[in-house]
Amino acid sequence: MNGKIALEEHFATEETLMDSAGFVPDKDWPELRSRLLDIQDRRVRLMDEHGIETMILSLNAPAVQAIADSTRANETARRANDFLAEQVAKQPTRFRGFAALPMQDPELAARELERCVKELGFVGALVNGFSQDNRSAVPLYYDMAQYWPFWETVQALDVPFYLHPRNPLPSDARIYDGHAWLLGPTWAFGQETAVHALRLMGSGLFDKYPALKIILGHMGEGLPYSMWRIDHRNAWIKTTPKYPAKRKIVDYFNENFYLTTSGNFRTQTLIDAILEIGADRILFSTDWPFENIDHAADWFENTSISEADRKKIGWGNAQNLFKLNR
């Protein structure tokens, strides 16, 4: 299947490269390093070999989100975004860009997103989970009141916001003590991101800004399979709603969220996601360079779904969501 659009596809700059070093054994680091730093060569050859027309590129994790000084976070984000814009300009039919944002300061983040969309031609933002800020005693999650003006900007710009995982801080990760194998993409990434997404849904954010579009990777970070139970238990005792939002959690999930297949190449999982959120809200992705492009493409092209859904997920939904001309 040619013409696929992939949208959780990472790169690194020399400045952010080492943030990815801990995700593979030392012996595999040279390979991952090479993959992260390459954009124009091997990546494009693999795209050609496996029918990927366009990649939407994003900075590796946690990068900007782990820089506790907001001024330095902003400077790092701007350098990464300028570098990405230069790379996209070399092959604008093959690459598009997601903005990295200094979410430590909502006003700076809104300004940088506006710059990236209006001046650099980016199609949205990808943010690596919560942000650290040396002015705050707690991690910053984006349902907090100080972020609502930022979300107003996102809605006004009419671009998607990809909420990408990161590990919890050590102070919040005691449950993983002695079980480091559960950290990262094995489990902790999904759990951390799912809770963050639920915070957004329950906060009332989507009542105030109903046109927001949030993307979750890895087939929804486990959320599609929990929607019924979340709403069922919240409604079990007939009292005032336990969260500020006006509607059921599943309503926001189905109306404000999109999912990608990044790093979750399992047919049963895809079918379950289709049954929960619908094929119109699922998009193909690979999670390169942390997953292999051939694994993602070979699975997707042979998975047991209808050809109509394969076209939607493979490229049609992304074309519509990002307003891409083909």
UniProtKB/Swiss-Prot annotation:
InterPro entries, per database record: ACMSD, Amidohydro-rel, Metal_Hydrolase
Source superkingdom: Bacteria
Residues where Mn(2+) binds: E8, H10, H164, D287
Pfam family, one: Amidohydro_2
SUPFAM superfamilies attached to this UniProt entry: Metallo-dependent hydrolases
EC number: 4.1.1.103
Description of how activity is regulated: Activity is inhibited by 2-nitroresorcinol (2-NR).
GO cellular component, one term: cytosol
Keyword check for Methyltransferase: no
A molecular-function term among this protein's GO annotations: hydrolase activity
EC top class, as a word: lyase
The keyword Metal-binding is assigned to this record: yes
Pathway(s) where this gene product acts: Aromatic compound metabolism
Cofactor: Mn(2+)
Catalytic activity: 2,6-dihydroxybenzoate + H(+) = resorcinol + CO2; 2,3-dihydroxybenzoate + H(+) = catechol + CO2
Gene Ontology biological-process entries: secondary metabolic process
Residues annotated as the enzyme's active site: D287
Summary of the function given for this chain in its UniProt record: Involved in the gamma-resorcylate (2,6-dihydroxybenzoate) catabolism. Catalyzes the reversible decarboxylation of gamma-resorcylate to resorcinol. Also catalyzes the decarboxylation of 2,3-dihydroxybenzoate to catechol, 2,4,6-trihydroxybenzoate to benzene-1,3,5-triol, and 2,6-dihydroxy-4-methylbenzoate to 5-methylbenzene-1,3-diol.
Subunit structure: Homotetramer.
Protein's name in the database: Gamma-resorcylate decarboxylase
Species of provenance: Polaromonas sp. (strain JS666 / ATCC BAA-500)
